[in-house]
A protein has these predicted regions:
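Nucleotide/phosphate-binding catalytic cleft detector across ATP-hydrolyzing
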Residues: 1-162, 168-174
Length: 174
């Protein structure tokens, strides 16, 4: 990114158990994928660790939900609110993020259907992403550990998550 670049970039691993956001090669958010919602308005009261601490300990006006199941979005509205709040947390140190120029790369399970991919893309856009890209989790894991995914050699990747486990062999960028 150049000195005057207003496009900010983050990578998000939207997991069943935890959500991680990376900015400038640093983990800036690592929180449980949990949202505490007001039962009347269905608005987020807390996300992440704060919502996790409320689980099972709140009064009848508040419910806690895990918006992802088996690596896919199960509750679109809750997922969107969780992503919006976590992106706010990740970007609060930089005033330029308040502009509409946010590029988000989101990891998705390799077995995702078109509907599931669209749900991730839509949630990311509604949460503030101007440009949204998806990448399969095994490919992101391979790139993240420094494997040359374009090399003509096979690399086995095992991605163990809270809702899915994926095993892939990556060679020649595919």
């Amino acid at each position: 990114m150049g000195l005057f670049s207003f496009m900010q970039e983050i990578a998000m691993d939207l997991g069943t158990a935890n959500t991680i956001i990376i900015h400038n090669d640093k983990i800036v958010v690592d929180e449980p994928s949990v949202v505490a919602l007001d039962r009347k308005t269905n608005k987020a009261i807390a996300v992440g660790e704060k919502a996790q601490q409320m689980h099972g300990k709140v009064h009848e006006g508040i419910k806690t939900v895990r918006p992802l199941r088996d690596g896919a979005i199960a509750d679109f509205d809750a997922a969107e609110q969780m992503m919006r709040e976590m992106i706010k947390t990740a970007t609060s140190h930089n005033r330029w993020f308040s502009s509409p120029s946010l590029k988000i790369v989101v990891c998705i399970p390799s077995g995702s259907t078109e509907v599931e991919r669209r749900a991730v893309r839509d949630s990311s856009e509604h949460a503030g992403g101007r440009e949204v890209y998806t990448i399969y989790e095994p490919m992101a894991a391979a790139i993240g550990v420094g494997i040359d995914v374009e090399a003509p050699e096979g690399n086995m990747i095992v991605d163990i998550g809270g809702g899915t486990t994926e095993i892939a062999v990556i060679s020649l960028a595919g």
